[in-house]
Curated annotation (Swiss-Prot):
The flagellum consists of an outer layer composed of repeating units of FlaA around a core that contains several antigenically related polypeptides. GO terms for cellular component: outer membrane-bounded periplasmic space; periplasmic flagellum. Component of the outer layer of the flagella. Its main location: periplasm. Residues 1-19 form the signal peptide. Keywords: Bacterial flagellum, Periplasm, Signal. It comes from Borreliella burgdorferi (strain ATCC 35210 / DSM 4680 / CIP 102532 / B31) (Borrelia burgdorferi). One of its GO terms (biological process) is bacterial-type flagellum-dependent cell motility. It holds the Pfam family FlaA. It is found in: Periplasmic flagellum; Periplasm. It comes from the Bacteria. The keyword Transport does not apply. This is Flagellar filament outer layer protein.
């Protein structure tokens, strides 16, 4: 009985903490919100430069001589809203559906009760009628686990760190009432994908869609501390945003599905380990820097390859170089003629 009472109390507290009312917010929507920020499309619309990824040094690496054909500006990318895309499930990838499944920046009206004047992510997906289909709304590149001088360039911009247990996930959405389900996909450093169901978008107006961990026990899960973990290097504890995924059932007649996303936040328990304060092991052995740099090198090479591959449809290029690249990227060691990050 006590456990049940505690669970009810936690539910009420977490509702107040994370699931705010959506109808009565005016300028209060600008105040600081709880949880760790994963993505804020209003911030990305204002200035995406902090998420810039420069791939220009990798063009000749993936295709010898291609730097004379590829424009340098095409190889500098960021998480700006215009760079996001919709990827339909294979069964729905007919030209008409692909052409009309797009993302676009959308300005919230000044009289809106929430996020007035902000520019957010607008999504339109065109599905076949009476067909079970899904689509992913994806960033322009995989979020790097390690990038920038400190390796933390993308923290709060698609990347979260030091995760022990995921408690809650919140997506602020404006829906037009379509019968479609929304999921959030994350990926850890081992390539494991995690799908979190946020529920239906069959409502009109603003809402905070929330996933809560059904296995999380408050005041117990957060207190479980294992100090038998070596201080350095720590095991993988980062997760990156992979995509939003929307799905519709075969019974739905609707084809057009439109909705808007303001931001994505998470609540989680953090890893608790004792800190080696006497010696800076990273400055001595550089395990994080070495593994992070190699991970970023591979990510940049693959992202560059994808972009050059798209250009290849418009420009005549020999087939052999692409096969050579595929073989090289799998076998080449980091120190062997790799471009600088």
């Amino acid at each position: 009985m006590k456990r049940k009472a505690k669970s009810i109390l936690f539910f009420l507290l977490s509702t107040v903490l994370f699931a705010q009312e959506t109808d009565g917010l005016a300028e209060g929507s600008k105040r600081a919100e709880p949880g760790e920020l994963v993505l804020d499309f209003a911030e990305l619309a204002r200035d995406p430069s902090s998420t810039r990824l420069d791939l220009t040094n990798y063009v000749d690496y993936v295709y010898s001589g291609a730097s004379g054909i590829v424009k340098p500006e095409d190889m500098v990318v960021d998480l700006g809203i215009n760079n996001w895309s919709v990827l339909l499930t294979p069964s729905a990838r007919l030209q008409a559906y692909v052409k009309n499944s797009v993302v676009a920046p959308a300005v919230v009206k000044s009289e809106s009760k929430r996020y007035a004047g902000d520019t957010i992510l607008g999504v339109r997906v065109l599905f076949p009628s009476y067909s079970q289909s899904s689509a992913m709304i994806m960033p322009p590149f995989k979020i790097p686990f390690y990038s920038g001088e400190s390796g933390n360039q993308f923290l709060g911009k698609g990347l979260i760190d030091n995760i022990k247990t995921m408690k809650e996930i919140k997506v602020s959405v404006y829906s037009l009432g379509y019968e479609i389900d929304l999921e959030v996909l994350f990926e850890d450093m081992n390539g494991m994908e995690y799908a979190y169901s946020m529920g239906t978008l069959k409502f009109k107006g603003w809402a905070d869609l929330i996933w809560s961990n059904p296995n999380y026990i408050p005041n117990i899960s957060s207190r479980i501390i294992k100090d038998d973990v070596p201080n350095y290097p720590l095991a993988s504890s980062k997760m990156r945003f992979k995509a939003f995924r929307v799905s519709k059932s075969h019974s739905s007649k609707e084809q057009n599905f439109i909705f808007y996303v303001k931001d994505l936040r998470v609540l989680y328990d953090k890893l608790s380990v004792s800190i080696d304060s006497d010696i800076d092991s990273e400055s001595v052995f550089k395990v994080y820097e070495t593994s992070g740099t190699e991970s970023l090198r591979k990510l940049k090479a693959h992202e560059t390859f994808k972009r050059v591959l798209k250009l290849r449809e418009k420009i005549s290029m020999p087939e052999g170089s692409f096969q050579n690249f595929v073989e090289k990227i799998e076998s080449e060691k980091p120190e062997e003629s790799s471009p600088k990050n």
